[in-house]
Amino acid sequence: MIQPDEPQDFPVKLIDKEQLTPTQIVEQLDKYIIGQKDAKRSVAIALRNRLRRQNVSEELRDEIMPNNIIMIGPTGVGKTEIARRLAKLAKAPFVKVEASKFTEVGYVGRDVESMIRDLVEQAVAMVRSEKTEEVREKAALLVEERLLDILLPPVSGLEESEHVGDEEEAVVVEGDAEVVVEKNLEREINRKSRQKMRERLRDGRMEDRQIELEVSSDGQGGMMQIFGPLGQMEEIGNIMQDLMSGMPKKRKKRRMTIAEARKYLEQEEVQKLIDMDAVVKEALRKVEDSGIVFIDEIDKIAAPTTGAGGKGPDVSREGVQRDLLPIVEGTAVSTKYGVVKTDHVLFIASGAFHVARPSDLIPELQGRFPIRVELKSLTEEDFFLILTQPRNALIKQYRAMLKTEQIDLEFTEEAIREIARTAAKVNETVENIGARRLHTILTNLLEELMFGIPEMVMDGTIDRNIVIDDNQVREKLGKLVADRDLSQYIL
């Protein structure tokens, strides 16, 4: 057998043991998503490969490209949720876009490069949030001092006297000892008053007190939003915002509570403490090394092969695919924060492919998504597990909401199975929208309860322990399921 040469010239580092293994990643995804093991395994391997790439030598690192994934399956089976949860696990910048919203360069609409600009914005916000947490404690102390300065303005002349040197003080003493004693006394009174006020601020006893604060008035803020929706106009909007931000801002005085002033001042102090150049640098690195772009509805830009030749909308669809090619393959995209290389951004595409097929994508784009995973339609048993097992299960959400009204809501196992059976049946007879069907069914099932509970609790006309059984489910939903027209519009 012919073996490739051993990579002796490429030293590697071992991956930190604290990093998630593919098995652990799948276990984490299992907490929120039922089934779809093939898709989970594929994204887990892709995430682990990123860690592996970051630990090889720099020379070889640039040669290792991500294995982009295309997920094929009907709506509501977990495609988007898998990608979103994966990004949270990886603590990576993540953006979800819809392929059908993009247009070919030269047409009115968003161009494909905007997805990378959105990803960079997401990364900057993420890093800024991390840095904010790091400086929040220091910012809180600075805000406290500023609030004390507003509540107890320093007495004129005290600050200067605090910095007087020994020799100068000696001269002052000889000149007028009484003035020095009086200033020292005022300084001590001010210090004690300030300490008492500080304690009251920390205890939260002054949060409702009104103070006057000088704030910047953002007169031009809303003006820039008109540039947003159109492709190239986004760049113009960014340039205009940068120009406006360089102009001196008007300041005006506003009356507000200390609680409101604290939030405003904290934002100001955090901005002063954070080095935005470092934030942008870190954000760009995160995008290039660990960014994830989820392209939904990619089947909408795949033109079915009909033998009619590319005409009408098919030409534009193919144009979008060709515009996507360099982005997915790896190119440099200009953003307002700098140039970003997309060579190692992970792209996960998804589509139902009811009409078109993956083979209807242009061959070059197919080659950029080497891993294909088919997600299965959800069964009645899957619906039952979705309602009971995930940490964010719908039934748990409704129970938590009604707890706020002092109501304990319970579902019998038979009731949950009846809900699952109803969801599966409606998906078969009307249109298969996957797990999203459970939202509409539970909303209709609990509508009267959710509407009338506040008054019934106040009147004492309701049992605090409510149990939903299968008979109630059939009684409430039976007619809707039986009538195809009703279920089509209501469920």
Curated annotation (Swiss-Prot):
Subcellular location: Cytoplasm
InterPro entries xrefs: AAA+_ATPase, ATP-dep_Clp_protease_ClpX, ATPase_AAA_core, Clp_ATPase_C, HslU, P-loop_NTPase
Keyword Chaperone appears in the UniProt entry: yes
Main location: cytoplasm
Family matches, as Gene3D superfamilies: 1.10.8.60, DNA helicase RuvA subunit, C-terminal domain, P-loop containing nucleotide triphosphate hydrolases
Domain of life: Bacteria
Gene Ontology biological process terms from the UniProt entry: protein unfolding; proteolysis involved in protein catabolic process
GO cellular component: HslUV protease complex
Record Pfam families: AAA, AAA_2
Subunit description: A double ring-shaped homohexamer of HslV is capped on each side by a ring-shaped HslU homohexamer. The assembly of the HslU/HslV complex is dependent on binding of ATP.
Entries under PANTHER family matching the protein: ATP-DEPENDENT CLP PROTEASE ATP-BINDING SUBUNIT CLPX-LIKE, MITOCHONDRIAL-RELATED, ATP-DEPENDENT PROTEASE ATPASE SUBUNIT HSLU
NCBIfam families: hslU (TIGR00390), PRK05201.1 (NF003544)
Name the UniProt record assigns to this protein: ATP-dependent protease ATPase subunit HslU
